[in-house]
Amino acid sequence: MKADVQEIRQGYGEIRLFPESVDDIWHLSHLIAPGDLVFAQTFRSVETATDKLRPEKAEKRPVRIGIRVEKVEFHQYSSRLRVTGLIESGPDVGSYHTLNLEPNFEVSVIRFWSKSDRERVDRAVNSSGSGLVHVLAIEEGEAELFRIRQYGPEQVLTITMGSGKGAPVDSREGFFIEAATPLLQITGPVIIAGPGFIKDDFARFLKNRYPAIAANSMVVETRRIGRGAVQEVIGQGVIGKIAGDLQLGREVQVMDEVLKRIAMEGLITYGRAEVGQAISFGAADQVIVSDRLIRDPEVARLMEQAEQMNATVTVLSSCFEPGERLWALGGIAALLRYAL
């Protein structure tokens, strides 16, 4: 993403944003909220004097409008963000309009920008030059390919074939060929992950049959398979080392710490009331929040108060397993400095 800060005073102002990928559109879904004023170019029917005589001939023309946001919907698989609200600037003031924001679509957002908002903008900008990392989670007879988005792993495809130990050699080789074929279209790094020896066998197959892919890949040992293997890879910090974006790795690590402390009845609390109390007493060292809640006024106040009390705030993606686990705990938790 590219960003151009127009003017911000005491946290309020305008930032022009240029999303370049579906990751950037996802970031936008957390940077635009009801009540914000959003400007973008769109198409609307603009009537001329001639059109009024023949209204059915009114043509749609590109116009720049500003809407007061009422609803924001992220459509992951169409790479689109739908932003609906009342027009405050431009033709047909007072009418409803929906902006369909896509990659390479400039938008200006006027709002109060919190510290976490600015950090999200910085993350999107800093990640714009990174190539997409893919993880092939492989086990005997099945391989799953995942594309690592900034909000978590996105499954691309699953390949299944009878390649167990009792299967013929050509069957296993056929499975490897099937698993390697989609990798030919990938330009970024590929991580081959899984338990046992099959990942190493597949890596040797790539080196012999597809050396260009092998040169752009690395092997990582995991205990789990499928999506679980991907989470292990991220938790080990491998993605961060390759792509330079450490956020997903932090999410895995912090949620592992939350669950560890819960199991040990350690310095941990969760739930709005409990976390709010910990923050007010200065006991919260790190506050962990689901991205589903960051626009909730009560939670936003807790995040601001936590930062004032020198606690760090970490926002977890609800599209990723650690964020799903946090949501099951009420969407907010805090690692404590001392017991309450």
UniProtKB/Swiss-Prot annotation:
Main location: cytoplasm
Protein function: May function in recognizing stalled ribosomes, interact with stem-loop structures in stalled mRNA molecules, and effect endonucleolytic cleavage of the mRNA. May play a role in the release non-functional ribosomes and degradation of damaged mRNAs. Has endoribonuclease activity.
Source organism (scientific name): Methanosphaerula palustris (strain ATCC BAA-1556 / DSM 19958 / E1-9c)
Entry protein name: Protein pelota homolog
Entry's family note: Belongs to the eukaryotic release factor 1 family. Pelota subfamily.
One annotated GO molecular function: endonuclease activity
Top-rank taxon: Archaea
EC number: 3.1.-.-
Keywords, alphabetical: Cytoplasm, Endonuclease, Hydrolase, Metal-binding, Nuclease
GO biological process: nonfunctional rRNA decay; nuclear-transcribed mRNA catabolic process, no-go decay; nuclear-transcribed mRNA catabolic process, non-stop decay; ribosome disassembly; RNA surveillance
Location(s) in or outside the cell: Cytoplasm
Keyword Nucleotidyltransferase: no
Cofactor(s) annotated in UniProt: a divalent metal cation
